[in-house]
Amino acid sequence: PKVSEEKGTILIRGDIKNDATQKALLELEHIIYHPNGSIAQSLKQSIQIKAGEQYSFRSETSPILSPQLWTPETPHLYRVESILRDKKTKTVLDQSNHYTGFRWFSFDGERGFSLNGKPYKLRGICRHQDQKPIGVALTDEMHRRDIKLMKEMGANFIRISHYPQDDALLEMCDKLGMLAWEEIPIIDIVPDTPGYTENCERNLREMIRQHYNHPSIITWGYMNEILLVTQRLYKKEEELKPILERTLALANRLEVVLKEEDTTRVSTMAFHGSNSYNEVGLGSITDIVGWNLYQGWYGGNLTGFEQYLEEQHKKYPSHPMIVSEYGAGSDKRLHSLQPHAFDFSIEYQQKYLEHYLPVLEETSYICGGTHWNFIDFSSALRDESMPRINNKGLVYSNRTPKDIYYYYKAAWRQDIPVLHIASRDWTHRSGIQHGKEPVILPVKIYTNLPEVELFIDGKSLGKQKTKNFAVTFEVPFCQKEHFIAAKAENRKAVQDISFVEDGIRLNFTPIPANLNGTNLRDLELAINVGSYCFYTSDESNLTWLPDQPYTENGWGYIGGESKSSQIQIKNTNDGPLFQTLRNGIEGYRFDVPNGVYEIEFLFTDIFRENATTVYQLGRNSDVEN
């Protein structure tokens, strides 16, 4: 088929099998409907098929002039109705309807991705088919809801990972306008197993044949991080070499199969951040390459992200690239004023993605990116702060958006005003108060408007200019509840309103810095030893403070070094309270007035040493009653 702004044709092909005991005289008609429902064109042909035989047909329309092009912004669909009749009686024997769209695209190592002849940045999301408590058995409406949520955020591209998903998902991609990468599940390692190659071939052919009519699909994928586990498990050359040879042979074979099935779309693989894929020859097989990059999460630092991309581009300038995965985990119970990698705080995920997204948007040779993942999803082998959950999602498992969702919405939705106080994930706050002075805590706003004014309990805190779709105010907290409101002038002409507003109520618990001169009767001081994060328990709403060094008249640790672990803590839902410690601590001191106090200790053995006695207060010789 051929398509341009001036004209386009539709190629219709298929098979008809005559299961009857006598020959069949048939009439096959194809009717093409414009997006508005009017008939654009029809084709008829007479067919004669002998008993038990199969007939393959192939018909191409004459040019349809000035076709309405399919894009994520204007997903115009043409309907192709195929009707099979008995030629003599005109009885309808079979009938089918398929939707298609007119669009063309290209990938280029220097210019990135183009759609219908124009540069187009792929703003994407990876998506697993999963939701608590039903697992992968989502209903059609759940699939449709996910695409609606992605579109509302401003996404135009989805990586359907790592396996073909329900037809309802692709139908919604076609209808609402979402470009798609679909792939078959080949991961971890290519085994020396009889029938493995044939099974992979069959999976690839089935996926393409089932879904090739969808105009949303632009690339077919196979293999995800195929060398990651291979290189971890096999270090010796004599062990690694045959596996790499099998992997390369399988990739070459699948590329041939893919091109046999579909020459109108491009092929791709997703690599983890290792140049080994290029060194062994995998990088030159597919039309485009995807990079799964996590600099600043699984090691390294944030700026390593753009450095890696630049290195790859310099070495292989003709390779079109997509960043097929990037992301950081977040647990809404964890918050930090000094976030760092792998603390699972909401704030570090925001910091990470606020660094990555501008790189993707501003680097012309990058075709686009797909954030990993759209949802918090089940992951059987994970421990971390939320066992069995990969929590890198932009929305929670129940599809409630995290605050970071609105950063993407502010960046990607230039057609509407976006203003969101990014504190829905941190509504119970706490802080150390010096005397009667208010506690200053940051409040962030995501917006695509140039300037924001913030109010606390009706009092203006002034205005700030937006930078990277975010504004952060230092807000004074001093009472149990505050109402925070944001206001911005609407510069988006699409909506006839002068100002955009958002508001939220935040709870606050002050903790006195000077314990010695304070009435502590109602004080509940909870400390997460060794942690830099605030932790609010789902079960009690109690907020545990980050650890701090001892100060006179206050409280804190004496000596030791902060350590952490990501192992699952059993028999509790408050795992993050037990995953940090101070190794070699000399003491913990509270300068409190004379009186009677209740002290609770929470213990676990994160080093799995199974010590018989972890701690017994009565055995310490320096205990003072």
Predicted features, each with a name:
Residues 8, 17-21, 216-221, 227-230, ...:
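Substrate-binding clefts and catalytic carboxylate motifs of secreted carbohydrate-active enzymes
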Residues 172-176, 195-200, 204, 283-284, ...:
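Short low-complexity, flexible loop/linker segments enriched in glycine and/or proline
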Residues 504-625:
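Compositionally biased, intrinsically disordered or flexible polar/acidic segments
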